[in-house]
Amino acid sequence: MAAGKEIRGKIKSVENTKKITKAMEMVAASKMRKAQERMRAARPYADKIRNITANLAQANPEYTHPFMAVSATAAKTAGFVVVTTDKGLCGGLNTNVLRAVTGKLRELESQGSKAEAVAIGNKGLGFLNRIGAKVVSHATQLGDAPHLERLIGPVKVLLDAYAEGKLNAVYLCYTRFINTMKQEPVVEQLLPLASDKLKADAGEHGWDYLYEPDAKTVIDDLLLRFVEALIYQAVAENMASEQSARMVAMKAATDNAGTLIGELKLVYNKTRQAAITKELSEIVSGAAAVG
């Protein structure tokens, strides 16, 4: 019964695959919970810096930091911070955000603008290289708990270029975490900082600060920290989205494997039944011939 043996081999192979996808689903679920905790833990820090910086900026309207406005002599070039994953098996997560990046690049190209990019994650780096984009720096293999130092080094290339007037905008591209079942690709303007980004929450007091050494130095440092916090938050959200998408993808793969095993077992049983029926028919026919 060669056909039956072949089907049994397929069933065994799919069962082994099912065990792997189930294990990957459980690992992704555990990592997702930790990634969500890191994502939520980063929000209060960014919110507090935003409120303090907003109050300082409103109290000193005569000073405009380079991050808050576009230089009149800025080059017609935009910078992109593209956040993707290092690994695959997470559904269409990377495809969706890279499609959004491509759309923005084409829009800017139609307006006569050039683009430079920093890639965070192997998938984005590979994509940008394939389409011939100018990648000025990158950060990969960040692990499950990224450190700010490893992120800011590459991104600072774009921040410095913007401050020097070599770029007229910087865009942050990542996947925003909505919930376990839904993630949203985002291409948002990082620089110049939009007015709503530097808006104090309702109920926040506008304190009369004393500055040491001076207001300009404090605002300069806080704005840099705020931009760093926005980038870290984007990476944290992208990682939470990655693990959620991977968990869902592996669950779907496990469910599909179970369905396929059921179908293969049905085929095997039918094949086996057909073989038994054939053998019985041959025995009966032989007995009838002898009789």
Curated annotation (Swiss-Prot):
A biological-process GO annotation: proton motive force-driven plasma membrane ATP synthesis
SUPFAM superfamilies given in the database record: ATP synthase (F1-ATPase), gamma subunit (SSF52943)
An annotated Gene Ontology molecular function: proton-transporting ATP synthase activity, rotational mechanism
Compartments it resides in: Cell inner membrane
GO cellular component: plasma membrane; proton-transporting ATP synthase complex
Keywords: ATP synthesis, Cell inner membrane, Cell membrane, CF(1), Hydrogen ion transport, Ion transport, Membrane, Transport
Top-level lineage group: Bacteria
Topology with respect to the bilayer: Peripheral membrane protein
Family designation: Belongs to the ATPase gamma chain family.
Protein's job: Produces ATP from ADP in the presence of a proton gradient across the membrane. The gamma chain is believed to be important in regulating ATPase activity and the flow of protons through the CF(0) complex.
Oligomer and partners: F-type ATPases have 2 components, CF(1) - the catalytic core - and CF(0) - the membrane proton channel. CF(1) has five subunits: alpha(3), beta(3), gamma(1), delta(1), epsilon(1). CF(0) has three main subunits: a, b and c.
Alphabetical list of HAMAP family matching this protein: ATP_synth_gamma_bact
Name this polypeptide is given: ATP synthase gamma chain
Species of provenance: Methylibium petroleiphilum (strain ATCC BAA-1232 / LMG 22953 / PM1)
